[in-house]
């Protein structure tokens, strides 16, 4: 439906029999009302045409071919001069055949039938509203027992005996056997109530506002009593309070949505449009039919049998009528939700029938597969892998996916640059993967963001915008810091790619949806792009070396290493000391690491511009060295000071590793970039 703000939305709920009748009934130009499906047939075996008043009737659901009736006559659709608007012989209107996708029919049930979703699904809505055990209501629905009608004025047979539910239950095999159909109907209408009709009467007598008042009052009284000290009684009171809360919420929902409780019992059963339950002809002339058609046929067969028992036959025992009502209830249950009451119904090949619930629920159901997860143009899907060299707002898009997503833009670029004369030539160049195609593709992608989505999209960070770049392979490369927002892992997860086409969508993607603009959780405001898993392990490896200072590394015999950071035998080199290398700047240290002269965690001395105020004055040097040029080296735990003869500081070296240098440079570049961005913004 469409609300007042012109937003399309879908709402599922109970409807009244009058609303079902308004949806399904239609008045033909001759005044005839059609819409009721009375025959369990589909197509005639000789003519292959839909049977009249059957499950595919053209009078009820519309013509199979646009503007052509069942007789074969043709009229122009929408031409007001064409008269009449329907075929007087077969009663089929001359309308578009697409009407068979939304025009419904109905089955008029011979007895009320309880909707199994409201009865058997947990929590049971009917049991909550009536405040009765579910097992007792099931016995009433499936005619296992009856209850006496509350007649105040007239003294009835059962009231004179003072009988109630469980006494009548013992009579359920005796009373119907001595009564015919007509006599049993008279007796039942006066004395007892059973089946879904009894549930309907109980629901119709409910006053939802009184339920709200009494339930709230009882909950308040239970809360004032407090704990009794008996664990069993306290649990019982707690369960009762939870039940009252559910009952109040359910009653409020019914009042708010203007739904009457008795609508949970069906008198008219809607029949889906034929295009949603098709019969398809395959090779060899065989027909494949939807399981729902077979379930509808079963309902119609049993309903017609019950109608005959109630109207035509006068000598049928009442027990047979009750049994047939139970069969109708079970047939409708199977149509709505096969297997909800136990063993599911199967066909001749021992295959379970797919009921209405199976068609709409789950990942392959109508909503998630066709409406929410349907395939759209300008979209793709692939596995995600980590791209540590990418920027936070970039993602790597495989060439195979990129050329398909941006094919129309590439074709326009080829034609504009006079590299192709028409669309066909441009597509040929794309199929042959000429080098010029990749150049134009990169130009197109440079100014066009893409959207990445990972299902299920539970919050707004489940879909974010990125600037794509071409990568080799068939997997989408993603920066590891954006993983948490998508709740994804690099263990085979897949993501969908979408291309925003309109200028409004592209502007929204750039201004609101880019990944570097969604660093905080929208729920609690905490940072969501934080290092985890592999990144933490990498940072640990970078900074794990040289953790215990110079003393532990130099004088521990198990830590003796050469200049290549290789372990040496401490006993064989007892008098040999390996000097740690000195570097004037970080570039020399990184160069030595790339030349494999040192390892990532090898300790080294790096010349550093360190403020003398940061040096602790009370710290005593571990040892001192005198150089040949008169310099004096004071060695501390994590730094070294070089002084001249006059005790003046010439330089300061810090003891570090290549991993620490890499981490420091990354942090320094990030801070400089942030400061530059702030200065550009001001």
From Swiss-Prot:
Its cofactor is Mg(2+); Zn(2+). GO terms for biological process: DNA-templated transcription. Mg(2+) binds at residues 489, 491, 493. SUPFAM superfamilies: beta and beta-prime subunits of DNA dependent RNA-polymerase (SSF64484). It is found in: Plastid, Chloroplast. Its main location: plastid. Pfam families: RNA_pol_Rpb1_1 (PF04997), RNA_pol_Rpb1_2 (PF00623). GO terms for cellular component: chloroplast; DNA-directed RNA polymerase complex; mitochondrion. It comes from the Eukaryota. Its EC number is 2.7.7.6. One of its GO terms (molecular function) is magnesium ion binding. Binds 1 Mg(2+) ion per subunit. Binds 1 Zn(2+) ion per subunit. The keyword Secreted does not apply. Zn(2+) binds at residues 69, 71, 87, 90. Coiled coil: none annotated. In plastids the minimal PEP RNA polymerase catalytic core is composed of four subunits: alpha, beta, beta', and beta''. When a (nuclear-encoded) sigma factor is associated with the core the holoenzyme is formed, which can initiate transcription. DNA-dependent RNA polymerase catalyzes the transcription of DNA into RNA using the four ribonucleoside triphosphates as substrates. This is DNA-directed RNA polymerase subunit beta'. It comes from Populus alba. The gene is rpoC1.
């Amino acid at each position: 439906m469409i609300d007042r703000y012109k937003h399309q939305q879908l709402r599922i709920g109970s409807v009244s029999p009058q609303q079902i009748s308004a949806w399904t009934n239609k008045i033909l130009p001759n005044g005839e009302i059609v819409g009721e499906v009375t025959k369990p047939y589909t197509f005639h075996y000789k003519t292959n045409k839909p049977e009249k008043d059957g499950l595919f009737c053209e009078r009820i659901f519309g013509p199979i071919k646009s503007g052509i009736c069942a007789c074969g006559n043709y009229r122009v659709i929408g031409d007001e001069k064409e008269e009449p608007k329907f075929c007087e012989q077969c009663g089929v209107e001359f309308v578009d055949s697409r009407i068979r996708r939304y025009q419904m029919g109905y089955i008029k049930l011979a007895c009320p039938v309880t909707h199994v979703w409201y009865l058997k699904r947990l929590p049971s809505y009917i049991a909550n509203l009536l405040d009765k055990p579910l097992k007792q209501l099931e016995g009433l629905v499936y005619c296992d027992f009856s209850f006496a009608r509350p007649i105040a004025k007239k003294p009835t047979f059962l009231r004179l005996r003072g009988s109630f539910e469980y006494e009548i239950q013992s009579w359920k095999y005796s009373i119907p056997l001595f009564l015919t159909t007509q006599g049993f109907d008279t007796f039942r209408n006066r004395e007892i109530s059973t089946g879904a009709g009894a549930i309907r009467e109980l629901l119709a007598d409910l006053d939802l506002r009184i339920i709200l008042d009494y339930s709230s009052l009882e909950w308040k009284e239970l809360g004032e009593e407090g704990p009794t000290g008996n664990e069993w009684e306290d649990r019982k009171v707690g369960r009762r309070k939870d039940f009252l809360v559910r009952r109040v919420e359910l009653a409020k929902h019914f009042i708010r949505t203007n739904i009457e409780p008795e609508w949970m019992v069906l008198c008219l059963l809607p029949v889906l449009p034929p295009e949603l339950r098709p019969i398809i002809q395959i090779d060899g002339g065989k027909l494949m039919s939807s399981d729902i058609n077979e379930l509808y046929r079963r309902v119609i067969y049993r309903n017609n049998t019950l109608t005959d028992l109630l109207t035509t036959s006068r000598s049928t025992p009442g027990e047979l009528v009750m049994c047939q009502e139970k069969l109708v209830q079970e047939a409708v249950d199977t149509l709505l939700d096969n297997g909800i009451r136990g063993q599911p119904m199967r066909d001749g090949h021992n295959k379970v029938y797919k009921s209405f619930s199976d068609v709409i629920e789950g990942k392959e159901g109508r909503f998630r597969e066709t409406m929410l997860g349907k395939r759209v143009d300008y979209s793709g899907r692939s596995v995600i892998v980590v791209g540590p060299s990418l920027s936070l707002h970039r993602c790597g898009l495989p060439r195979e996916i990129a050329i398909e997503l941006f094919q129309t833009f590439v074709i326009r670029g080829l034609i504009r640059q006079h590299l192709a004369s028409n669309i066909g030539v441009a597509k040929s160049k794309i199929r042959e993967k000429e080098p010029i195609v990749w150049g134009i593709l990169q130009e197109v992608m440079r100014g066009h963001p893409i959207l990445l989505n990972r299902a299920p999209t539970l919050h707004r960070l489940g879909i974010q915008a990125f600037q794509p770049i071409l990568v080799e392979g068939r997997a989408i490369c993603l920066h590891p810091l954006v993983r948490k927002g998508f709740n994804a892992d690099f263990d085979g997860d897949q993501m969908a790619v979408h291309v925003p086409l309109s200028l409004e969508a592209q502007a929204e993607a750039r201004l609101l949806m880019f990944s570097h603009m969604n660093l905080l959780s929208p729920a609690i405001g905490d940072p969501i792009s934080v290092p985890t898993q592999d990144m933490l392990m990498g940072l640990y490896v970078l900074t794990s070396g040289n953790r215990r200072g110079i003393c532990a590394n130099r004088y521990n015999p198990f830590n003796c290493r050469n200049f290549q950071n290789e372990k040496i035998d401490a006993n064989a080199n007892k008098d040999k000391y390996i000097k740690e290398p000195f570097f004037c700047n970080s570039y020399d240290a990184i160069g030595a690491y790339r030349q494999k002269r040192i390892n990532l965690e090898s300790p080294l001395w790096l010349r550093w511009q360190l403020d003398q105020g940061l040096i602790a004055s009370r710290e005593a040097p571990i040892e001192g060295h005198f150089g040949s040029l008169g310099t004096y080296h004071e060695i501390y735990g994590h730094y070294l000071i070089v002084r001249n003869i006059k005790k003046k500081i010439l330089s300061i070296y810090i003891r570090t590793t290549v991993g620490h240098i890499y981490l420091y440079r990354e942090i320094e570049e990030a801070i400089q970039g942030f400061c530059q961005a702030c200065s550009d913004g001001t």
